A protein has these predicted regions:
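Short helix-loop-beta junction
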Residues: 19-32, 110-115
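A short beta-strand-loop structural module common to alpha/beta enzyme folds
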Residues: 31-41
Length: 151
């Protein structure tokens, strides 16, 4: 049994739809438990007890959302040296190009020593069914890799 933590923040509902699709994809892999939490509700224990992490954020002013940053702020020092090479993926709902949010998350993930296992998924503009299918694939890929122990 592997546990996948999906931490997200959503203002307009787009990132939440993406998070639900990531969760749906992860649940397609047998013996996978999915923990889906808004960033403000996610805890250090959630992070430490997961085998894989998916982080979802809207792009706000070219950066990640403040609630995702808050999650990182609350968990960084207590989790340091306890999450070495934890596999993670990122999904971003962007009005612009999303790269500012992506870079910010990647810099913080380096400090945690997380291991990115799939390229960031950035949905630009209006969310499409194709975007949601890519989110499901993202969730399945993360869950399958964790389940098989290849990350």
């Amino acid at each position: 049994m592997s546990r996948i933590l999906i931490v997200y923040h959503s203002q307009t509902g787009n990132t939440e739809k993406m998070a639900l699709a990531v969760a749906d994809g992860a649940r397609r892999i047998e013996q996978t438990e999915v923990i889906l939490k808004r960033a403000q509700d996610a805890t250090l224990e959630d992070l430490l007890e997961s085998e894989g992490l998916a982080i979802g954020t809207p792009e706000n002013f070219g950066y990640m959302s403040g609630m995702i940053k808050d999650f990182f702020d609350r968990t960084f020092y207590p989790a340091q040296d306890k999450v070495f090479k934890k596999p993670y993926v990122v999904f971003i709902s962007a009005g612009n190009d999303g790269t500012g949010a992506q870079r910010a998350i990647e810099r913080i993930a380096l400090g945690y020593k997380f291991k990115m296992v799939y390229h960031p998924l950035i949905s630009k503009g209006k969310l499409t069914e194709d975007d949601l299918e890519k989110c499901r694939e993202l969730g399945s890929t993360l869950a399958a890799g964790c389940q098989l122990g290849i990350y």
